[in-house]
UniProtKB/Swiss-Prot annotation:
The gene is PTCD2. GO terms for biological process: mitochondrion organization; mRNA processing; regulation of mRNA processing. PROSITE patterns: PPR. Transmembrane segments: none annotated. The modification Phosphoserine is found at S378. GO terms for cellular component: mitochondrion. It comes from Bos taurus (Bovine). Gene3D superfamilies: Tetratricopeptide repeat domain (1.25.40.10). This is Pentatricopeptide repeat-containing protein 2, mitochondrial.
Amino acid sequence: MAATLRPPKQVLLLHALRSLVYHWVGGSGSTCCLCPLGAKRYLLTDSIVKLKEFQRKKVAVACNLPGTKETYLRNLEEKLTQNKLILKEELRTLLHLCTSRDDVELAKHVIYRYHAENRNITLGEYKFGPLFVRLCYELDLEDSAVELIKDQHLQGFFSDSTSFNILMDMLFIKGKYRSALEVLIQMKNQDLKFNKDTYVLAFAICYKLNSPESFQICTTLREEALIKGEILPRRASCFAVALALNQNQVAKAISIFSQIMNPESIICTNLNIMIHIQSNMLKTLIDILKDATEGNLSRFVKRHVFSEEVLVKVREKVKDVPALLAEFDELNKKLHRSGQVTAYTLDALLCHTPSDRQSYTVLLNKRTVSRRTFQPLSQSLWAE
């Protein structure tokens, strides 16, 4: 949808986004009351970033290059000087040869030339955006990626959500939350479709900024997604709940939490405790902990695990009620004895990226029978 056809709510959202970025007071780090350690972790799995795959291709390109890297770069510099046409394969090879900041500077000049020559050719065209962002990811040159992705002269070069997601993840790792928000603004301005990873990143960035403005942005993005009928990932909703709690919007936190499907994760367990703490539902809070310690469950049955940090907050909340305090102390001992307490903070749990599930799928789908002999694959290999 063109920018002129945006509904008023979306225009207000973009205005709020810009206002938060350009009128923010203070540092870019987290002021989250739930995360004193301010853990900086990545949010995307390697199946999305594909850094290892990119690095393997770099090695292959370097090995198969006719001549030397220096000669190849020099020839490209001459083509730029002589205003000669830059070919797609030349740019792709260049991006796989870059190993330094100087190499990336040359790549940026080649990208500008290539895009100027090919801006009107988009159908079925190779997408260089993710390739360049992965290169910046590898070399820790996030500023170069931000510079190009925001440049209006390169409008259309970064036409995919993957480029924006990887860059936001890179900025999140570095704690550059305001810059990450600028990238989110750019993505919104280009009307690129948000996927599940985008929502996780967007809500995580808002959570880290932890301000009334970022809470409003998170709320609006969430409402827009629900209006479109999109199902938000549980991780995204957890960030939204945590942000609402940090902003003391307990009713909103309860509302969001109630819509999470299958709230059985360790994060949801601890967010539920935080909701009860801030809602002053102390008796129910103790009952939840009691339920977690009772029952002769098999060691194969998943038990609820609580953050030590969250349990400290529970004790602080019930310390003025002697009966509840005594009951909590007993439950706390039981939880520790049964291994149901983790040293990870709630922030660390929120920002932890689960392992790739794709690799397990590949293993499950791995062929075990020969198509030729119909024997088990290991035996057929010996026979062949």
